[in-house]
Amino acid sequence: MTNKITERITGHTELIGLIATPIRHSLSPTMHNEAFAKLGLDYVYLAFEVGDKELKDVVQGFRAMNLRGWNVSMPNKTNIHKYLDKLSPAAELVGAVNTVVNDDGVLTGHITDGTGYMRALKEAGHDIIGKKMTICGAGGAATAICIQAALDGVKEISIFNRKDDFYANAEKTVEKINTKTNCKAQLFDMEDHEQLRKEIAESVIFTNATGVGMKPFEGETLLPSADMLRPELIVSDVVYKPTKTRLLEIAEEQGCQTLNGLGMMLWQGAKAFEIWTHKEMPVDYIKEILF
């Protein structure tokens, strides 16, 4: 890190955390601690292995210890709202939280995944406004992406998910998009491969917003056939470790433009950083370190 952490931690240092499982792969501690050090801010960011069973107790503990805030990742994004005091309008609409801020004992949940995804596309030179996208996934990140894309002006969104516990959540997402935005959303079963082929063929971007591709699912992909992809298609993955998932490898082989999850991670983190500190993250500096 820029400064030895022991040289800058004092009795006044405020703690910010990350709760998820698995957690050891995360680049968020590096990103935020480097940003704190660069700006001379008296915070430290630590990762905590937390799943469903521990979530309630951990939030109560964080509240009691007066943490400034924390990030939330899988599998906690759609459950943590029960233990918070308030939700931002975006988090309420999405039904998920990835950032919590503690303002004088009041815990407010925010969602920055969707804005991070759209900003990453913009920074990479991709414009999907007024166009159609196909996305796999129905968890917190996928929902945030779909809602933000719809709000930003994407014309159509086709969502694919297995008929698991998240399918009902995807049905709610489709209803929200169709009733509260000008975007048309549809939901399909992930096992309907012919429908997936059709929707990808009509889309400018295909996105994996599931954990498939990261540990313990490295080397796997939800894409049933490589010939569903075409050279002019943008293929993105929210997974950033590994930086090139099996999906992105296949996409490159098919001549597609590809985008991994690093950009989304950076820009959602920059927004969370601003929520906690009221300062702008030194994004160019962080890019040099992470990319």
Curated annotation (Swiss-Prot):
Its EC number is 1.1.1.25. Gene3D superfamilies: Leucine Dehydrogenase, chain A, domain 1, NAD(P)-binding Rossmann-like Domain. It catalyses: shikimate + NADP(+) = 3-dehydroshikimate + NADPH + H(+). The keyword GTP-binding does not apply. It comes from the Bacteria. Pfam families: SDH_C, Shikimate_dh_N. NADP(+) binds at G137, A138, G139, G140, A141, V238, G261. Disulfide bonds: none annotated. CDD domains: NAD_bind_Shikimate_DH (cd01065). Shikimate binds at S26, L27, S28, S73, N98, D113, Y240. Keywords: Amino-acid biosynthesis, Aromatic amino acid biosynthesis, NADP, Oxidoreductase. Pathway: Metabolic intermediate biosynthesis; chorismate biosynthesis; chorismate from D-erythrose 4-phosphate and phosphoenolpyruvate: step 4/7. GO terms for molecular function: NADP binding; shikimate 3-dehydrogenase (NADP+) activity. The active site is at K77. One of its GO terms (biological process) is aromatic amino acid family biosynthetic process. It is an enzyme of class 1 (oxidoreductase). Involved in the biosynthesis of the chorismate, which leads to the biosynthesis of aromatic amino acids. Catalyzes the reversible NADPH linked reduction of 3-dehydroshikimate (DHSA) to yield shikimate (SA). Homodimer. NCBIfam families: aroE, PRK00258.2-1, PRK00258.3-3. Belongs to the shikimate dehydrogenase family. This is Shikimate dehydrogenase (NADP(+)). It comes from Listeria innocua serovar 6a (strain ATCC BAA-680 / CLIP 11262).
